[in-house]
Design a protein with these regions (language model features):
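Non-catalytic helical/linker scaffolds that mediate oligomerization, partner binding
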Residues: 1-471
């Protein structure tokens, strides 16, 4: 069973039922809808299509809404585009002006208050670089450090700066409400810099019927990296947004940052998605480059929970083949990883009963060479805790409702199984767990299965039992 999950962005190339169904069969686990693009009407068609296909295929396909987030952009130029040279003076203004070779308006009204002399301003994904020399009222006077072409509405970023713009925009709120109405499983919150950003999203979801929607914080700047531990306290996991991150930090540091973030999340028991340009060349070509193959494999070696496709699956020529290729690379890489010694050597923090039971379950499964671990969980929390230890044993996550079943699709090494029966006793609980293991795996007489769960009070967080069964 493939352990590392695959997140796919759904766009024009993958919006038909036929193509999406083939992607699901090829290995798609989570369908991502990017709300930086498209209208609600267009996204409604995607929501309807995803729900229809996953119901027909009887597969636990989760739905992720990716927010636009707090974006900063230049506005427009009289002639659509300009060319700047190194050393040119240039002004950003919060006034409305017709842009030219000397000045352009910006989308964020408070920018002049948040920047300081000496700050760096990156435009167009960091291709054009400015240094702030003076600020007068609404005018931010800069010097061009690295020249290049600028055109309408290009993105801006500010390395090592936390701007004071309100994190949740009205558009993001409208999008979240729309997503809640459509039963989303995850929110990927863009440009998270601090714990409070996640808490703002959490509060909004809780107040509008999205209490069970899990938050994935997108780490896309240096401040997010610096605050990742406190951010993880408030969310279910992170996404390593290597595109914007590669603009904000020196590109040569990206591999080390990726390894650091993956390790941090794994030790904290949080999911981590590695994203951006993993198989970028397959937007146009039927085969990946050798470098892309190594990139995907290295993320798997690092221990990522999931790898993600963006333009490859949303707008590429070969969406199904791209998923097949991703799954093939992941599966082949996992064959060459000896997970047990890595698990034994790791210094995990055991903070509570669920942590302790989950760790003991994994130790026992390795000690007796179990064929499967079966975890019964009301909320999915115990399944996630077992998943964090990255053991070689296949994990079957038993969900008692569809919402949890879908969300388990993003957990490393977990095969979600839906069992909506009421567990009236621990005997019934473990009977159903063993039945799920037999149904999901090719077990032979003599095979050991380790099962864990809680009492049958119907209260989440009561995991306190371990049982070993021999087939």
């Amino acid at each position: 069973m493939r352990k590392t999950k695959i997140v796919c962005t759904i766009g024009p190339a993958s919006s038909s039922e036929e193509v999406f169904a083939e992607m699901c069969r090829a290995g798609l686990n989570v369908a991502r809808l990017n709300f930086s693009h498209g209208t609600h009407a267009e996204h409604q068609q995607k929501f309807d299509m995803i729900r229809k296909v996953r119901r027909e295929l009887e597969l636990p396909i989760a739905i992720m809404l990716d927010t636009k987030g707090p974006e900063y952009r230049i506005r427009t130029f009289k002639n659509k585009e300009i060319m700047l040279k190194d050393g040119d003076p240039f002004t950003f203004t919060t006034r409305q002006v017709d842009g030219d070779e000397t000045i352009v308006s910006v989308s964020y009204a408070g920018l002049a208050n948040d920047l300081s002399v000496g700050d760096t301003v990156l435009v167009n994904n960091g291709l054009v670089i400015f240094e702030v020399e003076n600020i007068e009222g609404t005018e931010i006077h800069c010097r061009v450090v690295t020249g290049g072409e600028l055109s309408d509405c290009k993105s801006m970023s500010f390395p090592h700066k936390v701007l004071e713009q309100v994190y949740l925009s009205e558009q993001d709120k409208d999008d979240l409400l729309f997503g809640i109405q459509n039963g989303i499983d995850f929110v990927a919150a863009s440009f998270v810099s601090r714990k409070q950003d996640v808490l703002d999203v959490r509060r909004f979801l809780d107040e509008h019927g999205g209490r069970d929607v899990e938050i994935i914080a997108k780490i896309e700047n240096q401040t997010g990296i610096d605050n990742v531990e406190e951010i993880c306290q408030a969310c279910s996991g992170i996404m390593i947004g290597r595109g914007d991150l590669g603009v904000e930090v020196p590109f040569a540091e990206l591999p080390a940052i990726q390894k650091y973030l993956i390790t941090k999340c794994r030790l904290l028991g949080k999911r981590v998605i590695t994203a951006t340009e993993m198989l970028e060349s397959m937007i146009h070509n039927p085969r990946p480059t050798r470098a892309e193959i190594s990139d995907v494999a290295n993320a798997v070696y690092d221990g990522t929970s999931a790898v993600m496709l963006s333009g490859e699956s949303a707008a590429g020529k070969y969406p199904v083949r791209t998923v097949q290729t991703m799954a093939e690379i992941v599966e082949e890489t996992e064959k060459h990883i000896d997970y047990e010694p890595l698990f034994r050597a790791e210094a995990f923090q055991i903070k509570n009963m669920v942590d302790a039971i989950s760790h003991a379950t994994c130790c026992m499964a390795c000690d007796i060479h179990a064929k499967a671990i079966v975890v019964s969980s009301l909320s999915g929390a115990t399944v996630r805790m077992v998943s964090r230890f990255r053991v070689p044993v296949d994990i079957i996550g038993m969900a008692t409702n569809e919402r949890v079943w879908y969300r388990l699709a993003l957990s490393w090494g977990v095969q979600p199984v839906l069992c909506e029966e009421t567990f009236t006793s621990t005997d019934v609980l473990f009977y159903n767990a063993l039945r799920a293991a037999k149904k999901s795996m090719h077990l032979q007489p003599g095979d050991n299965v380790v099962m864990t769960g809680g009492n049958t009070t119907g209260t989440s967080g009561n995991t306190n039992l371990i049982k070993v069964e021999t087939i």
